[in-house]
C-alpha cells in the first residue's frame, strides 16, 4: 500500500496512545504458563501480539477473545497442540517464545516470516546452549528448532546484543527444574529488563537482583526454579514507543499543543525517555492526568544517547530534520538487527527527501542535518517505525509518498487513522 502524506496543521488537540505491545507480549508469555485465567483489558491489536496469542495457543493455553479484552487460561507443563510456533515477524516473539518452547521435553520449530527470516538468532541459540538446550537450523532463511527441556544452571552470558532472550530466560527458568544464577555482561536496554522483572513480580515470580554495576553494564540475577506464574487481571499500559511519533507530530504540526493520553505507566518503558530527549532538544511539554502535553515549536538540536531505547531513532531522526542545528543520536550499533537496518535505511530514505544523514560507526553516532524536506517517495522497507517516521516528514515538511505503509500494523495498526483524526491529510496512491 502506498500512502501520500501532505503537509498539515492539526485540527484536534487530543489523541490516545496505542496499547504497549512490549507489555502485552510479556503478559501473554507468563499467562501461557500461569495457574488460572489471566484477563487482559485494553489489549494491543498489533500483529506482534496477535502472533503471541497464536503461540500461546500452540503451546497449549486456551484463549478467549472478547470485544476489548482477552482471557488466557494457562497450562504447565506445556501441552503443545502443534510441532511449530509462528512468531510472524516479531523479534521479541521469536526470542521470548523460543525460550518458552525449551520448557517442553521435545522439539518445537519456530516458523519465521518476512524480515525475521534474515535476522540473527545466534544469541538465542548460544543462550539456550548454556542451559542444555540445543537449537538447530539458525542460518538466515531457516526455521530454528528448539530441543528442550531447559534446566537451571549457573552461567555467564553476553547480554550486549539484546534484552529479548534474557526476558525469555527469566520467564522460563522460574518454571524449570533447578535454580539459576545469571552473570550478565554488557547489558543493553536495561529498562526493558526492568519491565520484565516488574511483570514477573506482579504474576508471582521471584527474581533476585543480587548485584548490579550500571556503569559497567553488569547484572547478577538469581532465579529459583520450580515456581509457577499466577494469573492476574491487567489493563495494558499505553505505548511510549508509539506515543513518541504522536508527540513529535504535536511538536511539528500542532497549532498550539497536542495532548497524548493513556500514558499512565504501571511498568517501566524504555521509550519514556522521549520526554527527556524532547526537553533537551528545546521542546516544551508538561504532564497531564492521563499522559503528556507537547507544545508546538521548532526543536533546537538533539544530542542524546539511545543505546537503551533504540526504537526512538526513527521519530527523533524525523524531528531532527526540522531542528535548528544538526543532531547527534548515539547508539547506532543497536539498529542493525531490527525489521530493517534502520541506520542505513534512515540515511538512504532521508537522502531522497533532501535530508543528509551521516553514520559514524567509530563514534556509534547518527548525525542528522536539518532540511528543508523535499517531496519524495520513500520506502518503509517493511519496517513499521520507518513508515511512521516517513509520515512525520510528510505532515511537517513536503508531500511524502510511503511505499509499504501497511507495515505499521506490526505495532500500531490504526496509526494512519489516528493521524487523519488529528487533521493530517492522507491520500491513497494507486499502484
Place the predicted regions along the sequence by residue.
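Short, structured segments at the rim of ligand-binding sites
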Residues: 1-431
Amino acid at each position: 500500500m502506498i500512502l501520500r502524506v501532505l503537509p498539515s496543521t492539526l485540527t484536534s488537540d487530543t489523541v490516545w496512545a496505542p496499547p504497549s505491545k512490549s507489555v502485552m507480549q510479556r503478559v501473554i508469555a507468563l499467562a501461557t504458563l500461569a495457574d488460572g485465567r489471566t484477563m487482559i483489558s485494553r489489549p494491543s491489536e498489533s500483529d506482534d501480539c496477535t502472533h503471541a496469542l497464536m503461540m500461546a495457543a500452540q503451546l497449549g493455553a486456551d484463549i478467549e477473545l472478547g470485544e476489548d479484552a482477552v482471557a488466557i487460561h494457562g497450562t504447565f507443563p506445556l501441552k503443545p497442540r502443534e510441532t511449530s510456533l509462528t512468531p510472524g515477524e516479531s523479534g521479541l516473539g521469536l526470542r521470548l517464545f523460543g525460550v518458552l518452547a525449551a520448557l517442553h521435553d521435545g522439539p518445537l520449530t519456530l516458523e519465521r516470516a518476512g524480515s525475521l527470516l534474515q535476522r540473527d538468532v545466534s544469541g538465542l541459540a548460544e543462550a539456550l546452549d548454556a542451559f542444555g538446550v540445543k537449537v538447530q537450523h539458525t542460518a538466515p532463511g531457516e526455521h530454528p528448532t528448539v530441543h528442550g527441556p531447559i534446566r537451571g544452571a549457573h552461567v555467564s552470558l553476553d547480554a550486549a546484543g539484546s534484552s529479548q532472550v534474557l526476558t525469555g530466560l527469566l520467564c522460563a527458568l522460574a518454571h524449570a527444574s533447578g535454580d539459576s544464577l545469571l552473570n550478565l555482561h554488557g547489558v543493553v536496554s536495561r529498562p526493558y529488563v526492568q519491565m520484565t522483572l516488574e511483570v514477573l513480580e506482579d504474576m508471582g515470580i521471584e527474581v533476585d537482583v543480587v548485584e548490579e554495576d550500571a556503569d559497567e553494564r553488569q547484572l547478577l540475577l538469581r532465579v529459583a526454579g520450580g515456581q509457577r506464574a499466577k494469573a492476574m487481571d491487567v489493563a495494558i499500559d499505553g505505548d511510549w514507543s508509539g506515543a513518541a511519533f504522536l508527540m513529535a507530530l504535536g511538536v511539528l504540526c500542532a497549532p498550539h499543543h497536542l495532548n497524548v493520553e493513556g500514558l499512565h505507566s504501571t511498568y517501566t518503558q524504555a521509550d519514556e525517555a522521549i520526554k527527556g530527549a524532547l526537553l533537551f532538544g528545546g521542546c516544551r511539554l508538561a504532564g497531564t492526568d492521563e499522559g503528556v502535553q507537547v507544545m508546538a515549536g521548532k526543536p533546537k538540536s538533539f544530542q542524546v544517547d539511545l543505546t537503551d531505547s533504540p526504537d526512538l531513532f526513527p521519530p527523533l531522526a524525523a524531528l531532527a530534520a526540522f531542528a535548528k542545528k544538526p543532531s547527534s543520536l548515539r547508539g547506532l550499533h543497536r539498529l542493525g538487527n531490527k525489521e530493517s537496518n534502520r541506520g542505513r535505511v534512515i540515511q538512504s530514505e532521508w537522502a531522497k527527501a533532501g535530508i543528509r544523514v551521516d553514520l559514524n560507526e567509530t563514534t556509534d553516532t547518527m548525525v542528522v542535518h536539518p532540511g528543508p524536506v523535499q517531496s519524495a517517495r520513500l520506502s518503509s522497507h517493511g519496517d513499521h517505525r520507518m513508515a511512521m517516521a516517513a509520515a512525520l516528514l510528510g505532515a511537517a515538511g513536503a508531500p511524502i509518498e510511503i511505499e509499504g505503509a501497511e507495515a505499521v500494523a506490526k505495532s500500531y495498526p490504526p496509526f494512519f487513522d489516528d493521524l487523519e483524526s488529528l487533521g493530517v491529510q492522507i491520500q491513497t496512491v494507486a499502484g
